[in-house]
């Protein structure tokens, strides 16, 4: 016979994960129409492979469909190489999307099964063969005939002879397991169900991680039978009763203790399949046509109560017109039968006489005490099964399935076959509780409370167990701990405590810990004993596994999931040190951020003061008094060569402007001395209320209409002045006198200096006269901030134009960029060519602007003048002030400090365009309104000033700021007018 090939060949790669594919294939639902049911393999895992005329016979591995009982086939000799070979084959079939119902799957499996060696079962005793079917028809025979119409009765299956030489002779049902009573009852009471319709293939069932949803690694989902006990596993809601379940196949195989399964070499089947996903369980698709079909009672007697559907009452309602005879039956038997039927929602009066006689005979044939256990199982566990199925259908992984207790029986299995049982029970590992000893009349049942807590109940004796399930755990230093490493650790621990590795059940990994439970063992070791021994042999376990064991103990599942990871964290010193450092770094970061915020706030308050302090001489701020100004005036007067008495001021301050063009030395007229007047009376305006409101409404509408404002600005940008030549400014000798090459004065509108008085012997300076209405007298001179080599030209322009007011709109340095050179002395006096400038006072009016007073003396003519500089500090380059109020207050100070204006005001920023043009536009428009002009066109006014100097008002924001400032000033004027 051909030897099976080793893994790694064509059969597949083997190893963990392959058995997950095996389980998914075993759980695939649906049957293609072309699949033949003759000799179909896998019926132990999917009973729908066999038709209602076929039976599923045991072949030692998957099960095979056969028409009729026939002759028992030899069992397969399953060895480790065989299992590995099948694992690879099933993995390849799984990768192709095939299931048990596909022809290709059946063909391949058939070929592989032919290669497996066979074992001939021992010849049964003549009494055994005669005991399979009753010699005389009787109630028990009727029961088997009615209860198993599909041929799934134990006799039809050809049950092997029980171990120990027991036979089926004598009473036909004397050795029938108590677990088989509920299926027989259900087949007896319920009519045969039609076969399943073809189900569709569900790819989601192939997900290898369905274990976390319906698996039973944690021990809370699944069932276990003690050795040799036939257990009925959990079935989906859509699946009808079947004796050929996965747990049933495990019990059938367990009866062959005399075969060669205990002599296997190499790793045991349980070790091969444990980490390969064989314990995974998938939920079958519900069948609409079978939604009301009865389910196989779980736990050997726990039948789900479908009281809401009332299926049993509907089926039996028409059969029980008359009550069965009860007087002739023993009272005890009637009580037992009543208790059993109560679990199914059936009353005695609903039974036919034939059904009543059959059930009563069956109860009498059962061993004494079994009925009582069954009654408790039916009454206690029915509601839990229904709840469990509903939770599985909802896919709720948080609610654990109730454990399925096992009932005592007579079929036993050898230790060697128990390993094969684990392999052939893919969906059901061992139960989470320690089973009662064989033959005990007490059955431990566990109910699930609404909070998910396990509540064990013992039928027949008081409860001796705590209400919560306990698990042993071993915490390691490896996180996450793999399942393979956890199983390896438990195998080594089993060797040290002289236990079988199969004694560990419900093995799972929670973070760095492996949790487990202990089944009943020969040494009678409990969880506490095993964990204590693990602590004693800690060093040996660490040496053999390479893991560091941090803690061992016994606790609940919740503790293993929640408490253990925290303990592992607390044990690691490096982790605690890192967490402490991170926390300290976070606190330090918060403190640093708070300190930076406070420093920035303090710096913002001191920035203006420091900036103002840098503009003036040291120690000069406290000495600027009006007395000092008077002393300076007296000092400058005594130094006059002509020693004239100062005359009465003339109404016009430009009456002596012509003296600038005279070569003879002339006295300095008082008209060129600006007399400060710090009055705060409101400006006199010739605006009436109606005109003011009209202008204000127009300005507000202009500002609200953003589209109109944008179109107006676009038109202003497209405007070109005529003429617009700048030849003088672009001359090679004058290029270095320009701060910005884009803002140059027009040839027809520029200030010309006297060549004979200029140190550079040139008449050029980057300055433009701005005429308001009188071409003979400009109202403003717009100029750039003086450069270091043009300061003398600037003072010459101030002297020759007769200006007494300078409006400076830029700081000297902004964001590290020099905006303007200092053209006045820090303290005392400074000489610029022939012009001596003496700083008289520097007064900080507010945080936004300050005022300086100068004496300007021409050393050639010995003439002295007084002038005032208003320096605005809160206007950023190419931007606008944060509010219009500071600039409007600044403008009022400029206009109120001097009576009349007969000479131009010098206005400069850095480039002499953006901020300079905005201030001139605001002041010009407001002056026109103060004179009573009825029509105001700000855009036309801007075009007018741009005809005289290019680039005035550089941005749309500056233009909008000018409109806003005009509107607010008009509003202030209207409030000041008498109502």
Swiss-Prot record:
Start and end residues of each stretch annotated as RESP18 homology domain: 38-134
Residue(s) carrying Phosphoserine: 307-308
Residue numbers marked as site, Cleavage: 448-449
KW Transferase (keyword) present: no
Alphabetical list of SUPFAM superfamilies matching this protein: (Phosphotyrosine protein) phosphatases II
Cytoplasmic side: 601-979
GO biological process, one term: positive regulation of type B pancreatic cell proliferation
Glycyl lysine isopeptide (Lys-Gly) (interchain with G-Cter in SUMO) cross-link, chain position(s): 754
Purpose of the protein: Plays a role in vesicle-mediated secretory processes. Required for normal accumulation of secretory vesicles in hippocampus, pituitary and pancreatic islets. Required for the accumulation of normal levels of insulin-containing vesicles and preventing their degradation. Plays a role in insulin secretion in response to glucose stimuli. Required for normal accumulation of the neurotransmitters norepinephrine, dopamine and serotonin in the brain.
Family: Belongs to the protein-tyrosine phosphatase family. Receptor class 8 subfamily.
Record protein name field: Receptor-type tyrosine-protein phosphatase-like N
Native species: Mus musculus (Mouse)
Gene: Ptprn
């Amino acid at each position: 016979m051909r030897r099976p090939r080793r893994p790694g060949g064509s059969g597949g790669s083997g190893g963990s994960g392959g058995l997950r594919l095996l389980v998914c294939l075993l759980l695939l639902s649906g049957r293609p129409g072309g699949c033949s049911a003759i000799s179909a393999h896998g019926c132990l895992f999917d009973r729908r492979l066999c038709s209602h005329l076929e039976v599923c016979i045991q072949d030692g591995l998957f099960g095979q469909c056969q028409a009729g009982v026939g002759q028992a086939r030899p069992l397969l000799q399953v060895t480790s190489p065989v299992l590995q070979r099948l694992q690879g084959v099933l993995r390849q079939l799984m990768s192709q999307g095939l299931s048990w119902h596909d022809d290709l799957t059946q063909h391949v499996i058939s070929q592989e099964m032919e290669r497996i060696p066979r074992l001939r079962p021992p010849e049964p005793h003549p009494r055994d063969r005669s005991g399979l079917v009753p010699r005389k028809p009787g109630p028990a025979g009727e029961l088997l005939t009615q209860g198993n119409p599909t041929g799934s009765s134990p006799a039809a299956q050809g049950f092997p002879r029980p171990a120990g030489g027991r036979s089926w002779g004598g009473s036909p049902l004397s050795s029938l397991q108590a677990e088989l009573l509920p299926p027989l009852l259900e087949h007896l009471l319920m009519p045969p169900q039609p076969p399943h319709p073809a189900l569709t293939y569900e790819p989601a069932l192939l997900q290898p991680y369905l274990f976390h949803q319906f698996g039973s690694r944690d021990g809370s989902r699944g069932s276990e039978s003690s050795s040799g006990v036939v257990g009925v596993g959990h079935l989906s809601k859509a699946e009808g009763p079947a004796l050929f379940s996965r747990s049933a196949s495990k019990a059938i195989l367990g009866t062959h203790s005399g075969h060669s399964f205990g002599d296997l070499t190499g790793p045991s089947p349980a070790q091969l399949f444990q980490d390969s996903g064989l314990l995974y369980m998938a939920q079958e698709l519900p069948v609409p046509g079978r939604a009301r079909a009865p389910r196989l009672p779980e736990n050997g007697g726990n039948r789900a109560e479908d009281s809401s559907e009332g299926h049993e009452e509907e089926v039996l309602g028409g059969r029980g017109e008359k009550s069965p005879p009860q007087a002739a039956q023993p009272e005890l038997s009637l009580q037992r039968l009543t208790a059993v039927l109560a679990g199914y929602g059936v009353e005695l009066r609903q039974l036919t006489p034939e059904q009543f006689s059959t059930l009563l005979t069956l109860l009498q044939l059962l061993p004494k005490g079994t009925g009582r256990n069954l009654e408790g199982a039916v009454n206690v566990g029915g509601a839990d099964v229904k709840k469990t199925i509903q939770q599985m259908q909802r896919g709720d992984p948080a609610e654990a399935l109730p454990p399925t207790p096992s009932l005592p029986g007579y079929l036993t299995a050898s230790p060697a076959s128990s390993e094969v049982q684990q392999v052939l029970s893919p969906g059901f590992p061992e139960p989470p509780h320690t089973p009662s000893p064989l033959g005990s009349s007490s059955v431990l049942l566990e109910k699930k409370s609404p909070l998910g807590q396990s509540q064990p109940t013992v039928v027949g004796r008081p409860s001796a167990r705590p209400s919560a399930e306990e698990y042993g755990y071993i915490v390691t230093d490896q996180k996450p701990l793999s399942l393979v490493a956890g199983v390896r650790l438990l195998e080594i621990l089993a060797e040290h405590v002289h236990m079988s590795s199969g004694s560990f059940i419900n093995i799972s990994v929670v973070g760095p810990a492996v949790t487990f439970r202990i089944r009943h063992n020969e040494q009678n070791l409990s969880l506490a004993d095993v964990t204590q021994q693990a602590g004693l042999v800690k060093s040996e376990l660490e040496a053999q596994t390479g893991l560091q064991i941090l803690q061992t103990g016994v606790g609940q599942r919740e503790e293993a999931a929640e408490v253990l990871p925290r303990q592992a964290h607390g044990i690691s010193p490096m982790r605690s040190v890192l967490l402490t450092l991170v926390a300290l770094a976070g606190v330090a970061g918060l403190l640093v951020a708070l300190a930076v915020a406070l420093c920035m706030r303090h710096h913002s308050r001191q920035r203006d003061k420091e900036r103002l302090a840098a503009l003036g001489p040291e120690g000069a701020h406290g000495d600027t008094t009006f007395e000092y100004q008077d002393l300076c005036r007296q000092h400058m007067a005594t130094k006059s060569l002509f020693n004239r008495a100062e005359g009465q001021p003339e109404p016009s301050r430009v009456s002596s402007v012509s003296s600038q063009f005279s070569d003879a030395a002339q006295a300095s007229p008082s008209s060129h001395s600006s007399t400060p007047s710090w009055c705060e009376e409101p400006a006199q305006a010739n605006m009436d209320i109606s005109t003011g409101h009209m202008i204000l409404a127009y300005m507000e509408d202009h500002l609200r209409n953003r589209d109109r404002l944008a179109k107006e600005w676009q038109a202003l940008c497209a405007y070109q002045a005529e003429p617009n030549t700048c030849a003088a400014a672009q001359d090679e000798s004058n290029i270095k006198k320009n701060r910005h090459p884009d803002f140059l004065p027009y040839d027809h509108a520029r200030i010309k200096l006297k060549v004979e008085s200029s140190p550079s012997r040139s008449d050029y300076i980057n300055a433009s006269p701005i005429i308001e209405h009188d071409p003979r007298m400009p109202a403003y001179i717009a100029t750039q901030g003086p450069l270091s080599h043009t300061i003398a030209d600037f003072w010459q322009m101030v002297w020759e134009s007769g200006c007494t007011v300078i409006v400076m709109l830029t700081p000297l340095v902004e964001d590290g960029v020099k905006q303007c050179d200092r053209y006045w002395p820090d303290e005392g006096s400074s000489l610029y060519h022939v012009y001596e400038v003496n700083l008289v006072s520097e007064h900080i009016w507010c945080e936004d602007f300050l005022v300086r007073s100068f004496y300007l003396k021409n050393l050639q003519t010995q003439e002295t003048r007084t002038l005032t500089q208003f320096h605005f500090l809160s206007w950023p380059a190419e931007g606008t002030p944060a509010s219009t109020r500071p600039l409007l207050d600044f403008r009022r100070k400029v206009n109120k400090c001097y009576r009349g204006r007969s000479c131009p005001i010098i206005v400069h920023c850095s480039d002499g365009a953006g901020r300079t043009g905005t201030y001139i536009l605001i002041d010009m428009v407001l002056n026109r309104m103060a004179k009573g002009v009825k029509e105001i066109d700000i855009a036309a006014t801007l075009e007018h000033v741009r005809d005289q100097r290019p680039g005035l008002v550089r941005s749309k924001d500056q233009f909008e700021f000018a409109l806003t400032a005009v509107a607010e000033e008009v509003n202030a004027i209207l409030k000041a007018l008498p109502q």
